[in-house]
């Protein structure tokens, strides 16, 4: 019957109940200690906070990188820039139209992930920004409607 007793002990909850009771007592003691500590502290504590600007909005930390991709794999470095919280200006004059569209599609997914924006600022030139940048104004009125991209 030693085998039966061993199996019974393995599936028995007697030890589990013992440990659960110990944990309950410890948590009760910890709660009592924390209430004693908080009651000895003053009720009204004045906390001063300094107004901090987010890292992306601080003009000293904001960067805009210039990219002129020549192959599709250059899109990874542009995406890394955006994911790092920095803006990029991308000039597609050195790449064919099909590759430029693929890169724009890739960057569109990256921008969607960080809730950013892509803005066309010239013929074959785009401004790509994460959500920490704000773009105001439009340049599309000055661009040709049937031009590249």
From Swiss-Prot:
Keyword Electron transport attributed: no
One Pfam family of this chain: SepF
Biased composition (Acidic residues): 13-24
Polar residues bias (residue ranges): 46-57
InterPro entries linked: Cell_div_SepF, Cell_div_SepF/SepF-rel, SepF-like_sf
GO annotation, cellular component aspect: cytoplasm
Start-end of Low complexity biased regions: 25-41
Lineage: superkingdom: Bacteria
Keyword vocabulary terms for this entry: Cell cycle, Cell division, Cytoplasm, Septation
Region called Disordered, residue ranges: 12-57
Family in the record: Belongs to the SepF family.
Assembly: Homodimer. Interacts with FtsZ.
Function: Cell division protein that is part of the divisome complex and is recruited early to the Z-ring. Probably stimulates Z-ring formation, perhaps through the cross-linking of FtsZ protofilaments. Its function overlaps with FtsA.
Protein's name in the database: Cell division protein SepF
